[in-house]
Design a protein with these regions (language model features):
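Ubiquitin-like/PB1-type beta-grasp interaction modules and other compact soluble beta-rich domains
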Residues: 2-4, 8-32, 37-236
Length: 236
């Protein structure tokens, strides 16, 4: 029997690694570019709008913020909660300054130096705003005060800041809340606050004091005419 020839195995074939397909990059069409620019534009517009909204809320809240956190006037020492007339309540003035955010000054401030006029009517009759409100026995005066009984309010501060009606009434030592002035509360005696002859709709305590305002508090039956302006003396 013939001997079978052994076959030499064929050498292994080289296996080529898969090649990454490299198609030439298709240039963007004008429509593609236009869509891309529009998408970027919308994104930027959204970012800008969000920034403006945040800025508006910050500025709005800051501009409407009260000069200080308004204290409960009933908690102020020596506050008068009875009917008019009301005195200047000077004996207890030092104890009211800190909760009102005010200071005992040796001189009138000049950084803020503005004036307002205050009228108060009870059933058509004018109530006197006392002289020397906020001036303590010649020892000190505070940023908000009066020099006479004309109703002129003096706001004189050594630092730039805002002041409100709550602070003036706190210095005066007369209760002022959203519903009560002194002993007059809206549940029993209606009253309204007017600024330059127009009814004020907000919290009366938060009214910011500005130059040459005519402020009128009308309790009960109003006078024939609500004052809308006041003729300040020269220099005020």
């Amino acid at each position: 029997m013939a001997k079978k020839k052994s076959r030499t195995p064929a050498p292994p074939r080289k296996v080529q690694a898969p090649q990454r397909r490299t198609d030439p990059k298709r240039p963007r069409s004008p429509e593609d570019r236009r869509f891309l620019f529009m998408a970027i534009g919308f994104a930027l517009t959204g970012v800008i709008a969000l920034g403006v909204a945040v800025l508006f809320l910050f500025v709005f809240n800051d501009s409407n913020k009260a000069a200080v956190d308004i204290p409960n006037s009933d908690s102020l020492v020596g506050v008068q909660t009875g009917p008019a007339p009301w005195n200047a309540a000077l004996d207890t003035l030092p104890g009211r300054l800190e909760p009102l955010g005010l200071n005992a000054l040796t001189n009138e401030g000049e950084v803020v130096h503005i004036h307002q006029h205050l009228d108060i009517y009870v059933n058509g009759k004018k109530v006197t705003v006392p002289s020397q409100i906020g001036i303590y026995d010649g020892q000190f005066l505070t940023e908000l005060h009066t020099h006479d009984a004309s109703g002129i309010m003096h706001v004189e501060s050594p630092t730039k800041r805002k002041f409100d009606l709550a602070q003036f009434f706190g210095v005066w030592g007369v209760r002022l809340t959203p519903s009560c002035v002194g002993g007059y509360c809206k549940e029993l005696t209606p009253w309204r606050l007017y600024v330059d002859g127009k009814a004020y709709q907000g919290d009366p305590r938060a009214l910011e004091l500005k130059p040459h305002q005519e402020i009128a508090i009308v309790i009960g039956t109003p006078p024939k005419t609500i004052p809308s302006k006041y003729k300040f003396p020269p220099g005020l």
